[in-house]
Amino acid sequence: MKKNILTTLVAALVYFLCIGVGVLLGNLVDHTGNMFYAPAFSALVGGSVYMILLAKVPRFGAITSIGLVIALFFLGSKHGAGAFLPGIICGLVADGIGHLGHYKDKVKNLLSFLVFAFGTTGPILLMWLTPQAYIATLIARGKSQDYIDRIMVAPNPANILLFITSVLIGALLGALIGQALSKKLAHKTS
């Protein structure tokens, strides 16, 4: 039990670092400063951590814990009321999907990660669902009007489709890489 908790905490820390790498990669693709591509790149980079955690700790709660860490980050970093909700909701739902397959079913684990990847979308969703509140949060954090104008992404159908598609592609690739790496690590230890 103690080993599972430690493994989960380490995975949460490493996944959090993957989110940071995802933000950096997103900024390389889009120089506006918004986080539009960060969830997709975070999923691409974090898929391996997720799949290895499922192999090492095949119990309900591990994935929920990482979702909670993501949620607490968004809550603590003042991204706006509600930005933390996707982390909690996606973490719980993803954990439930993985649990249905006893964390051994490749397809359910893949679906689980596709859902989990949307846990980092809170700030973008808030920008689209409550733009005035999102702008007020940015102003309260000391952001200039120029910055705000640059990072706001209109919630038109093309942008929404691009956002969802990019997250799904990043998550799919991240999960497949993660499953291959997890399998390789399992063969090395046996």
Where in the sequence are the language-model features?
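Membrane topogenic helices and adjacent juxtamembrane segments
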Residues: M1-N27, A136-Y147, M152-A158, K183, ...
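Hydrophobic transmembrane alpha-helices
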Residues: M1-S65
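Hydrophobic alpha-helical transmembrane segments
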Residues: I5-V10, A40-F41, I63-L68, F84-L85, ...
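Aromatic-anchored segments of alpha-helical transmembrane domains
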Residues: Y15-V21, V69-S77, F116-L125
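Short helix-perturbing small/polar motifs within transmembrane alpha-helices
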Residues: G87-L125, A175
